[in-house]
Amino acid sequence: MSKQPDRLFAQPLEQVPDFVFNEDVVRVFPDMIKRSVPGYPTIVENLGVLAARFAQPNTALYDLGASLGAVTQSLRRHVRSDGCRVIAVDNSAAMVERCRQYLTAQDSMFQELLPVQVLEADILALPFEPASVVAMNFTLQFIAPDQRLELLGRIRQALLPGGALILSEKLRFADEQEQDLLNELHLDFKRANGYSELEIAQKRSAIENVMRPDTLEAHQERLRAAGFSKVVPWFQCLNFASLIALP
């Protein structure tokens, strides 16, 4: 499957619509996220490594907000616990269709991968099976803020003792100087990856009402309120971070 360069915002738009994960985004998503999220490949590959430590036999491993299945593929490559299966969930029909294609291609290249089920569903309404690993890779930031605690509480209830939630998010910072610095460094990262000022500005307009990042402290406080006993930051690159939350 060919991967197209992200040129979605390269031409001036009279009105910039809110960002949605539609077919246009799906076509360029691998290029978009690689050029927009510093550290993304490192997070994805190591999610599988981390999951292998917490995965337990005969349990579910969830990839919530699976998009094109990069995390699911990492889980399948690294986890070897008997009887595990991956449940990849996304609410975008276009993402789910392409995700299934990528996973079929992975099956043709590798043997003895974990079985996988791909669901087109709203994770806010999803009934969770007993799970040893739940991955949310840049997903919670697209959930309405007043619905995040309830979702995390349900995930906590589904997690078995010894399991883990691995949560990756874009961060904002309470300190104004820190926020401004890391925001500018992130823009420099995008410029270095070939995005023009027009593309950066229009993408920001499209996503600012859709993605609502939290501070690290807000994440830690919410996870504790949801019933997690320990929250361990394991990765940060600029204003993007990943946490391990233990039940």
From Swiss-Prot:
Pfam families: Methyltransf_25. GO terms for molecular function: carboxyl- or carbamoyltransferase activity; S-adenosyl-L-methionine binding. S-adenosyl-L-methionine binds at Y40, G65, A66, S67, D90, N91, D122, I123, N137, R204. Gene3D superfamilies: Vaccinia Virus protein VP39. The keyword Chloroplast does not apply. Homodimer. This is Carboxy-S-adenosyl-L-methionine synthase. The gene is cmoA.
